[in-house]
From Swiss-Prot:
Gene expressing this chain: trmD
GO cellular component: cytosol
Assembly, per entry: Homodimer.
Name of this chain's protein: tRNA (guanine-N(1)-)-methyltransferase
Family note: Belongs to the RNA methyltransferase TrmD family.
Entry's Gene Ontology molecular function annotations: tRNA (guanine(37)-N1)-methyltransferase activity
Xref: InterPro entries: Alpha/beta_knot_MTases, tRNA_m1G_MeTrfase_C_sf, tRNA_m1G_MeTrfase_TrmD, tRNA_m1G_MTases_N, tRNA_MeTrfase_TRMD/TRM10
Residues involved in S-adenosyl-L-methionine binding: 111, 131-136
EC nos: 2.1.1.228
One BP term from GO: tRNA N1-guanine methylation
């Protein structure tokens, strides 16, 4: 079982958030352990001080090194991976979340105020992770994003064994649109193929629609996906289909105007496939 210890000045933010939904069920089922710890328990003064002014001046306070270090030492062991949530870190990706889910023990450090002392980072932190190119008031939300993202790759956490593998980004593509009852709603009909019962046909259709959605919404990801598909295509001795982009264009042409609309693909045109 993956054990996660979160070091934060606001442990109630962590414990409250992980007690609901999928994470809450994972904790109850002993598939995952999340505990929050505060440096305040090691503060020796009557005000339980955990921050101080930075040397050289500047805006914001810095978390005190001594109390933070003791918090780290309390939970760290030889198999721990210590992560500092920081806007300077590498951006969290689906692959990174999957990698972290394989760890034995994670220690997530949540900064506050102006951050933490660089010497703590130099000595204890194995990796800095960011959840995006923006700044938050603390690392707690980032830690929760990391926990939620990695938990989806832990066997048994999601209701369906294939759920994580079919989510957006799992194969380098965004997820296809999903529909439920009623069949017709807001003047839009569910695509007929999804009602066919032909599982192979549906799976192939969903993959191509995912590619089209990625082309429209994340062309940067589509370029990477297309390069990989072209490499696979070149390796084939017997080519039963057209070149990947041409094959996708052909599929798009065969979609009815109604299907393009309900799938949110009506903005694509022939120029979209010039790549």
């Amino acid at each position: 079982m993956l054990k996660i210890d979160v070091i934060t000045l606001f442990p109630e933010m962590i414990q409250g958030a992980v007690s609901h939904g999928v994470l809450g069920q994972a904790l109850k089922g002993d598939l995952l352990s999340v505990q929050a710890h505060t440096p305040r328990e090691f503060a020796s003064d009557k005000h339980r001080t955990v921050d101080d002014r930075p040397f050289g001046g500047g805006d914001g306070m810095i978390m005190l090194s001594e109390t933070l270090e003791k918090s780290i030492q309390k939970v760290q062991h030889k198999n721990s991976k210590v992560i500092y949530l920081s806007p300077q870190g590498s951006v969290l990706t689906d692959d990174k979340a999957r990698e972290l889910s394989q760890a034995e023990h994670l220690v997530l450090i949540c900064g506050r105020y102006g951050g933490i002392d660089q010497r703590i980072i130099n000595t204890y932190v194995d990796e800095e992770i960011s959840i995006g190119d923006y700044v938050l008031s603390g690392g707690e939300l980032g830690a929760l994003v990391v926990i939620d993202a990695l938990s989806r790759f832990i066997p048994g956490v999601l209701g369906h064994v294939d759920s994580a593998d079919k989510d957006s980004f799992s194969e380098g593509l965004l997820e296809h649109p999903n529909f439920t009852r009623p069949r017709e709603y807001l003047g839009q009909d569910v695509p007929e193929v999804l009602l066919s019962g032909n599982h192979k046909l549906i799976a192939d259709w969903k993959e191509k629609v995912s590619a089209l959605v990625t082309l429209k919404k994340r062309p940067d990801l589509f370029i990477i996906y297309l390069a990989e598909e072209r490499e696979k295509y070149r390796a084939l001795k017997k080519k039963k289909t057209a070149e990947p982009l041409k094959e996708l264009f052909k599929f798009w042409q065969q979609l009815s105007p109604q299907d393009r609309e309900v799938l949110g693909l009506e903005d694509l045109n022939e120029e979209s496939f010039n790549g």
